[in-house]
Amino acid sequence: MIPLLSAEQLRQADANTMAHEPIASIDLMERAATACANKLMETLACDVPVAVLVGMGNNGGDGVAMARILNMAGQPVRIIVPRYKPQGSPDFEANLGRARKDRIPVDFLEEGAELPAFTRGTLVIDALFGTGLQRPVTGWLKELVMALNQRPDPVLSIDLPSGLFVEVNAANDPEAIVQADRTFTLELPKLALLLAENARYAGEWEVVPIGLDREFIASLKTDAVVLEAADVAALMPVRNRYAHKGDFGHAWLLAGGEGKMGAALLAAKACLRSGAGLLTVHVPAGQDGVVHATLPEAMVSLDEDGTALAGLPKFEKVSAIGVGPGIGKADGTARMLKLLIQQAPAPLVIDADAINILAENKTWLAFLPEGTILTPHPKEFDRLAGKAANDHDRLMKAKELAVRLKAVV
């Protein structure tokens, strides 16, 4: 699992690495810049001009150091510094001095100045602001960001697109955030990069390791983590070479209705693909033919109703039950769902129309067995938990709902 740190925790991780490695802050900056420059040069043609737009803090220092490294590799590079305060951070100023000694062109923009024109095909590296930003970009700097976003030049952001906050962006100004084509985020993913509404800012992003103290990072308490394939693989039991289908559980799927058997088939295929040894699909009477023809490995149970599910099957040797895809919201189907969650003989996975039924009958949520899995898409979730103002708000509502229901959402 990869922890998703807050801005303050990211600062602590930097400070801890510097104190305990030990390494000076300017040397850690050099390490980060080298890692980003090397990653960029894996795909960047040697004749592509690069313009590095830097702020006067440590994210800007990363950008200046990166410009120096690219220059040493023979890349045509220039540095652009919007001078929004008299003095930059010590590490920024030190790197700027080194860049001048290397005779890298440096353009200072005084307040009110426009973004200079770039040679056609220039790659712009955005190193204005990093994870320490705590308020929206305003005034002249916002105008520069807006001008950059209107340019056709490709943009690579370092750590985060300038203007984007690490976690919550509800109070941010969407016009004051750089819209990058690509983002190199340092050491760890950031929560903001994982929210769909921020995709237009980050573009394609990837993590660039810079050697922070992972033991310290693992000791921090975080509200969110990213699951990796290895985390899931560790939960999968090793299959005995002499095992057979009866050793891997019997799943039941209550799905489908008149005109919606495709949903049942897709869910059934996914269930078998996930590793269930046996699968019985409960469908309306007369709808079994398509299941037999498409999934001969699945067994079929027939409901008494011919258009929608209206009753519970006689469950036999059931390990888990999925319900919802394509079932509709008829009164009889709703009654069936209520009985199921009240009498469930096995763990439940609730999806699609079953979630929509619960959204219209929220008092039934009290009947959900502990450990139930709910799999709504955003619209279904909003019906169930209330309309979310943004993706982060939806994430917080999902957390609250999961805790309240003792469920997985």
Stretches with model-predicted labels:
Residues 65-149, 289-301, 309-317:
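N-terminal small/polar loop signature for handling phosphorylated ligands or for N-terminal nucleophile
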